[in-house]
Amino acid sequence: MGKYFLAIDIGASSGRHILGSLEDGKINLEEVYRFWNGMDEENGVLYWNVERLFDEIIAGMRKCREIGKIPESVGIDTWGVDFVLLDKEDKILGKAVGYRDHRTDGMDGEVYKIISEDDLYARTGIQKAIYNTIYLLMAVKKI
């Protein structure tokens, strides 16, 4: 039995578990699990159901066990701008509001009252997009 490595890719509309292995110097990739993904809406707020996402991650790992291919390591790739706030006991505070939610509308102007757009870019190198984390954080501050 060879060594297996699991990559979990969670995108905005689907997620998948890909097992990788080496055989005769070649990389083999096998999709072992796929699931639907998308934001939920509650009271006009778009958010990620992180509990469901966690359940999907576990389901894909169970699938690896079912087919007898236990990974030695796991890597997870997700979208890069959303976040959850945690309390001192690492419990999630509120919803994991998604980047497509409209709470960031106008938050660029609020951020630029603190730091200019040019200075922000010089410090981060991140292209301006209204869904970037800094605007989500400003929206949280304003709520």
PLM regions with names:
Residues 84-142:
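Glycine-rich phosphate-binding loop and adjoining helix at the ATP-binding site
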